[in-house]
Amino acid sequence: MNTQQRAMEGDLSRIVAISRKEKDAVSRNDKVDDTLNGYKELFKGNDDKAIQARKNNYTHMVNTFYDLATDFYEFGWGQSFHFATRHKYESFEASIARHEMYMAHQLGLFPGMKVIDIGCGVGGPMRTIARFSGANVVGLNNNEYQIQRGKRLNESAGLSHLCSFIKADFMHVPVEDNTYDCAYQIEATCHAPDLVGLYKEVFRIVKPGGLFGGYEWIMTNKFNPEDPVEVNIKKQIELGNGLPDLVKPAEIINAAKAAGFEVITAFDVAETSELPWYLPLSSGVSITGFLHTGVGRYLTGKFTQLLEIVKLAPAGSYNTNVWLQNAATFLVQGGEKQIFSPMFFLLCRKPSTD
């Protein structure tokens, strides 16, 4: 069996998992439509009151989002739920791995180090970074479904000795002060209700002199809050990705400083990419890449609809797929207008006590 055949086999197994409701999917049930509608209620407005409501309910909001989206993400994107810069002639999979290894390189990871991945998803980046660096990586996640899925993937990859999980809210990590040598997050802390509060918690658990790196989702400085078209793109990105409120680069930097970190570097990595970061959402030539295209997403939707009709999928799976397709459309629009980026890179240091 060649690589493409193995990839296709894995993809087909995951589209069945979209709806088979694996036994460890704690918060899942057959009322997918009700869950999706309840999630959408949190995004009825975009004024300060509505944004605050999303922040107040962020744990429920984010868990609901990932209960709905995880299997679709893994089927159409892979085990690493993030974007990446991309060079000409570089495959999508290679760009994703390089993006993760760049983080490990910037943090200076090596065997024996103890590192925490803030908001680790099903652990794709964690496994890449553990393989690349030899460091012990602990994945922090508050979604039980993703953790159970990630544990199986760790075991399958032969990395259970280097990769593990903690189930907890990243605003309240149940570990002692100065526990980890380094910390990182890849497109995860955009879900935080209070960025300063989150960064303070990361500051607390990292050892003095330790580094914290992250890829943040931002509205770039080109975003015009007075332009209704751009405001709608922002709102739709937030709705489609379980976010309380997207901010500009200065707020990211100021939050890190307010938490006590020394900011080493901060820049939008997307500006260094030879190919647009959103290219996988609009084109692709591999089997996996095809699933990212408009045609691929359409066919995925039709197959999901068929599963509903023959009762292999609960009602609402098709609507969930349509909702995620819509989210992809607005991510592309934000990228094309250069008003949104999912990879504002921030590297900070916790001051040494010396």
From Swiss-Prot:
Q: Record's superkingdom? A: Eukaryota
Which controlled-vocabulary keywords does the entry list?
Answer: Lipid biosynthesis, Lipid metabolism, Methyltransferase, S-adenosyl-L-methionine, Steroid biosynthesis, Steroid metabolism, Sterol biosynthesis, Sterol metabolism, Transferase
EC code:
2.1.1.41
Main enzyme class: transferase
Q: Which reaction does it catalyse?
A: zymosterol + S-adenosyl-L-methionine = fecosterol + S-adenosyl-L-homocysteine + H(+)
* MF term (GO), any: sterol 24-C-methyltransferase activity
Cross-referenced PROSITE patterns: SAM_MT_ERG6_SMT (PS51685)
Biological process according to GO: hyperosmotic response; methylation; response to bacterium; sterol biosynthetic process
Where does it sit, as one GO cellular component term? phagocytic vesicle
Q: Name one Pfam family in it.
A: Sterol_MT_C
User: What sections of the sequence does the record tag as coiled-coil?
Assistant: none
Q: In which pathway does it act?
A: Steroid biosynthesis; sterol biosynthesis
**InterPro entries the UniProt entry points to:** Erg6_SMT_methyltransf, Methyltransf_11, MeTrfase_SMT, SAM-dependent_MTases_sf, Sterol_MeTrfase_C
* Sequence similarity: Belongs to the class I-like SAM-binding methyltransferase superfamily. Erg6/SMT family.
The name of this protein is Probable cycloartenol-C-24-methyltransferase 1
